[in-house]
Amino acid sequence: MNWIFNTLIQFLEDLNIDPSVVSLIDEDAKKLEEQFPKALKHPVVDEEIVYKILCEKYNLNALNVKTISETLNKEYKFGRNSKTALKKYLDYGKEEYLIQFFNTLMLENNTYIDREYIESVLAFCEPVSKEKIKNEFIKLWNEANEVNEYGKLKDYLLGIYSKLFSMGLENLRLIEIYNSNESLIKKVFKYESTIKELKEYCLSNQESITAGLAIKMFNEKYMELMKKEYQQDAIALKLEEHMNQLYVDNNINEYPYIFDRGNDILLLPTEEYDFVYFHIDQDFFNRFQDENKFLDYVLSSIKQIYRVLANEKVFALKIDNIYNNEKNLKWELYPKLTIYSEHFIQTKETARFYKAYDIAKDLLSKHEFRLLENDSEKNRENILKEYFSGKISEDELFSLVHVNMKKEHFFEFLNRFKYVHYGFTFNDCLVLDRVDKSFANGELENVISNATEILLIFYKFRADQRRIPCPSCGSLNISGNSYPEINNRSWECKSPYCPDRSKSNRGKRYSKKSNYMQWGAIYPKSHDIIPRELIKKWRRDIIVINNEQEIFEMLVKYFSFTDEKLLFINTNELPSVVTERENRKVVILSQKLKEKAYTSNVVVKESLEGEIEFFKNGLYLKNFTELYLPEDQRRVSPEINNFLNSGGRLKLIQGDSYEVLKSVEDNTFAAAVTSPPYYNAREYSQWPNLYLYFNDMYNIIKECFRTLKPGSVFLYNIADIVDNENIIVKSSMGNKRIPLGAYTIYFFQKAGFELLDNIIWDKGEPQSNRQKNDGKFTPHYQKPLNAYEHMFIFKKTGAPLTLSDDWQSKRGSWIKNIVPFQPVFKINSKGENILGHTAPFPEDIPRFVANVFTKHDNDIILDPFSGSLTSAIASYKSNRIGLGIELSPDYVELSRDRALLEGVTTKILNFN
């Protein structure tokens, strides 16, 4: 019997538990001992070691960590790494762990620390008693033992055994990790040469090193070879079409500067770069002199960027102010590039998480879809499931259902959902306030000054089912079919000797992305630590920028590690000032560097074009607008028009906004302003999926276009949100940041509106002072806090922009296209929000529209989603006629009461 069993038996006897129960883990222990026999040669002499292991597993020092960190937080930045190192010291009490804690704290703060003071704080910490640990274990043991749950008893014992076993493996050789995984390695890699290279690498590093470092080195080589095999398959054209490398230039990787003749991006190796920055500006646009050709080239470049960017890494896209015939294209490009980037890959999805029948069923609700017999929600789902799985034919399905669609339309519609549309994952839209520059602003040139640029951040998550080693033990004995994000697969370690098994002996859960983030945090190099000043500057998603290098510094520090290879495309300034200082390898692809650049001799016949078809005939966008709904009959309602023309300056129509607007005459309203219901973000706004949300919004937007006067404006306030689009999967794996602003612009323009500008509503400092970085100060953890909403200024075409005669004296603080003001909550003496509405917006917004973009006292200003009547009341106060449309009876009553508080009576028409 080895020292590990002896230690475990001694612990059980101390708790008066029959030590013979260790036989439950005999078989598992034997397997471990065969793989790593040397673990049995290093006995742990601390007789209390099992109690310390359990103290760690049960997180019993959590309160001590909290108390100490709060005390030290006055002097030091106390991140997640420092807390983890502190907990390890408190759990085990080893001097080496105390030194690790000091070093971690010093690294996170980038300064020397007062060790004597910190030790005095630690001295006041009350250690977790042996009795408390014992009672915790006995409680769990007895609960399982009383109902004969031998599986749990085995897990409890194996959890202790595996931790002791891993302690016997304080030092490892790489070949030991390889040997323990050899059979699985041969299943993961395709080529004998790859397996041979991995084994030779492990044999060439025969030195016994700390287990953590050995596992990290093994994993890094393993991931390098995974990339190498993938690149080989890309050149051999064995991958999906969008990932294959059609042209090869064996010399191109030797040069840091590359002159792109127009399509040389096709020569760059697949998944070669750990970060890609793509900059589009006026000079870039001028090479084309045609908006569609320019857009096609940019879209095609984004498609290639997806190919060349390493998986789970970041793509940053900077959009400058670009002019075509005096029209600023900046915010017009934003929706096209964002929507395309997220959805340009059309593919048939066979993964179990995608339920085409469920998504289609939601949209068919618009067509009175039902079964002719035994109709129920579940049976509708089942019949569609049978169709999508090929069990019934089109004719059979159509004979069993009622649906308000022609047969050919029905199946064209259904068959769209055999495909999903992937791409990058939208992460953020950062608004850059360029205090060093000012830009022209089209029709708003003299009204609102323009000082903004856009920086979009995307992640790439390409589905990759190949196993990756556990970061804690290096094992490939893993399983898992869950996804933190779509296409970002996570694994659970099944190795019984993994040191990071949980309280219930579950294995460590990890993904490729979490691995490189955690290793960067655990083994940070000096250039990987992000300075406190940089985090403070980029804390919010509206950032004052003085020069281009500030942008490079953030991108390099936030989204790359030391020695990684970064690709910059079409930069105005060289990023080498930052990249050389931060020890990154940089490649620049540009048409501006002819004199120093490498020009390939490989002739590329393919052209970067054809991607604009995504917007003309792509299936993805059809799902929002081409639903084959019956054409609505528009009938002008005398009742509504009499109501609009009657006396009174504050009016409210209770009814569905779309139905009301269909009944209004053309060219009725002088302006519109609203904050619509955000997709599933409030209790009053719930849609099954994003398709149906924007289908409803689009129909209302079209009616607003028809009923507005030519030259009038529509100010539309909306924010990007975190939610599930429910167009691929309905579980939490589908949760992501949804660029509602991008879709809003797209559908307004499709309805006929012209976008004049996006005025940024700066909502000030977020209520939380917490930086979203999980307490870590290394790459990929930083997340700026959302501090703004969009206020899009759309104009109905057909006439010059309508401006009031005295707009200059009435525009107030609306001088430039970033306007700061706080959200409004009117609180009474009882601390209650008397506006009642969960998302009220300031009267400054509709007042700005009334004062600047309308001319006459009898002008009607429309709010199609009235809420608590803010827009109509502000219009009334500006001596205009304010009209709200509101579906909810509760909000109609709230609006009436609110107006009375303002001393105004509301004229209300019920149009339900």
Swiss-Prot record:
Organism superkingdom: Bacteria
EC numbers on record: 2.1.1.113
Keyword terms, alphabetized: DNA-binding, Methyltransferase, Restriction system, S-adenosyl-L-methionine, Transferase
Keyword Methyltransferase: yes
PROSITE patterns attached to this UniProt entry: N4_MTASE
Family: Belongs to the N(4)/N(6)-methyltransferase family. N(4) subfamily.
Stated role: A beta subtype methylase.
Name the record gives this protein: Type II beta methyltransferase M.BslI
Encoding gene, per UniProt annotation: bslIM
